[in-house]
Amino acid sequence: MPTGDFDSKPSWADQVEEEGEDDKCVTSELLKGIPLPTGDTSPEPELLPGDPLPPPKEVINGNIKTVTEYKVEEDGKKFKIVRTFRIETRKASKAVARRKNWKKFGNSEFDPPGPNVATTTVSDDVSMTFITSKEDLNCQEEEDPMNKLKGQKIVSCRICKGDHWTTRCPYKDTLGPMQKELAEQLGLSTGEKEKLPGELEPVQAAQNKTGKYVPPSLRDGASRRGESMQPNRRADDNATIRVTNLSEDTRETDLQELFRPFGSISRIYLAKDKTTGQSKGFAFISFHRREDAARAIAGVSGFGYDHLILNVEWAKPSTN
């Protein structure tokens, strides 16, 4: 590889290191050939050890300002700092211009005009938008009718009066038996169905859980006639109500809990889909007494249940 000898002038940094033993960092001889940013080639004063540092010098040439400062390091070496600024003229409001003329105080009492990098951080401008009261009123959201329903209870628990189903009450194992026992003592038990004057008590099968075969003639209900042969079948049709607008998750137990407080229920029919098993949205509830059915219509019709408004009316009599 060809090589050649180049007669290059040593750099200023190399000469400073070579003269470090003499504690001469910057001399007039080294500064003669270095042009200043302002175009001034006048020699700089010699920085000799023990001599005081020259005062800072500021030169303005058009829109360029050059600031020259001298400092001493910990090891005693002296060096020069040259900073160049571009002067820009910007229009500001009277309030901003007035604040810039305020007298500085504290550690910045003797600082020159303008920000000091030691105590001031210059960042991007933040624009602020002030909204008047009229604009604030226009930005208000319109009142949503559904917000009024948020504070209302759609479902009420019979045990703790909370906004959840009675079957999902966390206190049903503790408060439920206590309320039932208290109701039995007062004669207001809701667990026992009301008996009609002509209704027979069902015959309980004695020891029917032993695994032995029990003939149909000895099973529970063998001494009673079939449901279709009862004389009060037609009376049930007169005390039957029709409930519509039910949710798909409604079950017979939910209807039993909803309508039991109004009276004794003889039967419940909930229309379900054959494939999915979900409710079709309507059901029929038959009471033993027509007065109980009338009270159920007055109490449940228009009631909010599972986020839906129920519609209860008299069922049309069967044509069969």
Swiss-Prot record:
Q: Which residues form the RRM domain?
A: 239-317
Give the record's keywords alphabetically.
Cytoplasm, Initiation factor, Nucleus, Phosphoprotein, Protein biosynthesis, RNA-binding
Xref: SMART domains = RRM
Spell out the protein name for this chain.
Eukaryotic translation initiation factor 3 subunit G
User: What disulfide bonds does the UniProt entry report for this chain?
Assistant: none
Query: Where in the sequence does UniProt note compositional bias of the Basic and acidic residues kind?
Result: 221-233
Q: InterPro entries of this UniProt entry? A: eIF3_g (IPR017334), eIF3g_N (IPR024675), eIF3G_RRM (IPR034240), Nucleotide-bd_a/b_plait_sf (IPR012677), RBD_domain_sf (IPR035979), RRM_dom (IPR000504)
User: What does the subunit comment say?
Assistant: Component of the eukaryotic translation initiation factor 3 (eIF-3) complex, which is composed of 13 subunits: EIF3A, EIF3B, EIF3C, EIF3D, EIF3E, EIF3F, EIF3G, EIF3H, EIF3I, EIF3J, EIF3K, EIF3L and EIF3M. The eIF-3 complex appears to include 3 stable modules: module A is composed of EIF3A, EIF3B, EIF3G and EIF3I; module B is composed of EIF3F, EIF3H, and EIF3M; and module C is composed of EIF3C, EIF3D, EIF3E, EIF3K and EIF3L. EIF3C of module C binds EIF3B of module A and EIF3H of module B, thereby linking the three modules. EIF3J is a labile subunit that binds to the eIF-3 complex via EIF3B.
In terms of HAMAP family, this protein maps to:
eIF3g
Is Kinase one of the keywords?
A: no
Recall the GO molecular function terms of this protein's record: RNA binding; translation initiation factor activity
The protein's location, in the record's own words, is: Cytoplasm; Nucleus; Cytoplasm, Perinuclear region
Modification sites for Phosphoserine: S8, S11, S42, S189, S223, S264
Q: Which GO terms describe its biological process?
A: formation of cytoplasmic translation initiation complex; translational initiation; viral translational termination-reinitiation
State its role: RNA-binding component of the eukaryotic translation initiation factor 3 (eIF-3) complex, which is required for several steps in the initiation of protein synthesis. The eIF-3 complex associates with the 40S ribosome and facilitates the recruitment of eIF-1, eIF-1A, eIF-2:GTP:methionyl-tRNAi and eIF-5 to form the 43S pre-initiation complex (43S PIC). The eIF-3 complex stimulates mRNA recruitment to the 43S PIC and scanning of the mRNA for AUG recognition.
Main subcellular location of this protein, as a coarse class: cytoplasm
